[in-house]
């Protein structure tokens, strides 16, 4: 909704509502072997150490096991696929014994309701200056639960934490996923395992001022905001009987920041630009809870991230060359990271939170476009950057087999950000004439790091193994 108050003042108000539903299925197993043909313990490399020097895995018996696994996978393409007939047969066999399904398909659901009210006032103070003032209020409700998608021919399945059976005796309340409905029978379409909602409330007020002053164009902006979040559990987990059902406390955060950006026209096609910013940013809900599938606990030492950012750039334009050169530096303090993964060695899901983590991001970027002819351009792009942790972090982890937390130090200093090239380059030719557009490009990527597992960087076990100094 737009309200033109006068020819220099305008108020724009927006109301937005959005509901989304997302689900994904997964083949799972219960008190039996992993049926995936690419399960690492079924691959040849798990039996014999081909490239290493571990004598324990280089015996004649290990080599024979390697050959057996290799021959099995190469004998038929069917051996490299899931054998659904075998899974159905296994479930039908245990039906007569009154045992729960050995294999089943679960469905994870993440549904999201988001409502936003925002308003912005724009005031043209002069022909060369503008002031903006606005606010936004956001409410978000995320529903997260798991249902039984397909029992694969089985008759029964109970809402029991089978991962913890080795830790607690059969029949123990600690094994119940929902003490409000103990030993509940799960049919296709029923919820099991976990069911909770995350409620997030946000509000912020912001303002910015822009002005063109001769050869200088600049903008100053600031904002202050509130973030609140809580968890509402729908199941009373046996490992956290008093801290999993119902609403948690609400975590409250005051956030805010300011930034400056400006550019100066030096003439003859040259422009220099500068940007600076500092912000206190509230943690997001997806990293704020220690084990949201199990309890209401927030991550310990949860704080605002402190973010400093800066950028300096130079741009040159003339009839035959367009060039951009820029450098940037950013630092993040008090970062929080959260991961959950299945730890096969102990048959458990592990919930890990890293807090007090400091990071740096810096680099340089160059882009050039040469006009070789009226219809042919040569383009060159390149970047070299760094994105890494500059400190160790506090770690707290919880395994789904037991309801106890472990605190330690994660030795993650100098670990890089994963999944993105820190060095990249591109060369290309662009042809455009007579309605035809043809591009030929060559790209180069380097320093793409794999993600690391915090589990293998806990200080206490590494000290016991004498794998670290001090």
Residue spans for each PLM region:
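Gram-negative outer-membrane beta-barrel transporters
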Residues: 215, 329-331, 352-456
């Amino acid at each position: 909704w737009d309200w033109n108050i006068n020819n220099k003042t305008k108020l724009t108000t927006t109301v937005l509502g959005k509901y989304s539903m997302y689900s994904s299925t997964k083949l799972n197993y219960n008190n039996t072997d992993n049926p995936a043909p690419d399960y690492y313990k079924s691959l040849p490399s798990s039996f014999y150490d081909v490239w290493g020097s571990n004598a324990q895995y280089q015996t004649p018996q290990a080599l024979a096991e390697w050959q057996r696994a290799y021959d099995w996978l190469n004998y038929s393409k069917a051996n490299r696929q899931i054998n659904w007939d075998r899974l159905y047969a296994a479930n039908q066999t245990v039906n007569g014994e009154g045992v729960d399904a050995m294999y089943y398909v679960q469905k994870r659901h993440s549904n999201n309701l988001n409502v936003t009210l925002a308003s912005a006032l724009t005031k043209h103070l002069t022909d060369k200056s503008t002031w903006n003032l606005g606010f936004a209020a956001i409410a978000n409700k995320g529903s997260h639960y798991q249902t039984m998608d397909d029992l694969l021919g089985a008759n029964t399945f109970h809402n029991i934490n089978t991962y913890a059976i080795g830790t607690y005796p059969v029949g123990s309340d600690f094994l119940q996923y929902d003490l409000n409905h103990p030993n509940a029978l799960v049919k296709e379409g029923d919820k099991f395992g976990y069911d909770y909602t995350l409620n997030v409330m946000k509000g912020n007020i912001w303002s910015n001022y822009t002005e063109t002053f001769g050869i200088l164009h600049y903008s100053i902006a600031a904002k202050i905001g509130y973030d609140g979040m809580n968890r509402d559990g729908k199941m009373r987990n046996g490992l956290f009987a008093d801290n999993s059902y119902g609403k948690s406390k609400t975590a409250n955060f005051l956030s805010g920041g300011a930034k400056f950006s400006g550019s100066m026209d030096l003439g003859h096609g040259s422009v220099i630009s500068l940007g600076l910013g500092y912000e206190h940013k509230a943690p997001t809900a997806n990293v704020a809870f220690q084990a949201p599938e199990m309890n209401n606990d927030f991550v310990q030492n949860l704080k605002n991230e402190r973010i400093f950012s800066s950028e300096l750039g130079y741009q040159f334009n003339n009839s035959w060359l367009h060039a951009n050169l820029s450098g940037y530096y950013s630092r993040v303090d008090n970062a929080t990271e959260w991961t959950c993964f299945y730890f096969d060695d102990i048959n458990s899901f592990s919930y890990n939170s890293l807090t007090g983590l400091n990071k740096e991001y810096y680099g340089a970027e160059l882009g050039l476009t040469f006009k070789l002819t009226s219809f042919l351009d040569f383009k060159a792009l390149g970047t070299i950057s760094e994105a890494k942790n500059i400190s160790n972090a506090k770690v707290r982890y919880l395994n789904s087999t037991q309801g106890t937390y472990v605190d330690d130090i994660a030795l993650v200093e100098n670990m890089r950000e994963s999944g993105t090239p820190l060095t990249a380059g591109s060369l290309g030719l662009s042809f455009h004439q007579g309605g035809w557009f043809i591009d030929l490009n060559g790209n180069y990527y380097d320093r793409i790091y794999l993600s690391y597992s915090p589990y293998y960087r806990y200080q206490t076990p590494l000290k016991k193994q004498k794998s670290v100094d001090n």
